[in-house]
């Protein structure tokens, strides 16, 4: 997995978190979750330094969907997005921004 691809996915996540949210804030957050997951899948996590490792751990915690039920098949990320507090939303936005910058500085 390339740093460039991850930077692109995190840039997309950051973009959907910006106003306005035509499909609602929760849907924007769920879409950003999906973009972050795509940016990190198959990425060797041993490549992260101390700072980025902390952001990744924060991101993993914010995106954690274990124990969430989805009887109406809305999508686990959408349900998780609805559960985030304002502080969680702020932390998520900050982590996405930090990781996008980190990946961008290391592009192939």
Where are each of the predicted segments found?
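Short terminal alpha-helical segments
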Residues: 1-34, 93-100
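Non-transmembrane, amphipathic alpha-helical segments
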Residues: 2, 17-21, 25, 44-51, ...
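Generic signature of intrinsically disordered, low-complexity segments enriched in small/polar residues
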Residues: 6-8, 13, 36, 46, ...
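Generic N-terminal initiation segments characterized by hydrophobic and/or small/turn-forming residues
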Residues: 14, 37, 56-59, 65, ...
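Amphipathic alpha-helical interaction modules
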Residues: 19-68
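Amphipathic alpha-helical binding modules
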Residues: 71-108
């Amino acid at each position: 997995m390339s740093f460039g691809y991850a930077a692109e996915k995190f840039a997309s996540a950051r973009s959907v978190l910006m106003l306005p949210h035509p499909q609602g804030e929760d849907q924007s957050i769920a879409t950003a979750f999906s973009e972050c997951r795509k940016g990190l899948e198959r990425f060797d996590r041993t490549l992260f330094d101390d700072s980025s490792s902390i952001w990744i751990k924060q991101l993993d915690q914010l995106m954690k969907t274990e124990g969430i039920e989805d009887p109406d098949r809305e999508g686990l990320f959408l349900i998780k997005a609805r559960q985030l507090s304002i502080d969680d939303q702020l932390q998520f936005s900050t982590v996405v921004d930090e990781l996008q910058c980190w990946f961008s500085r290391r592009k192939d």
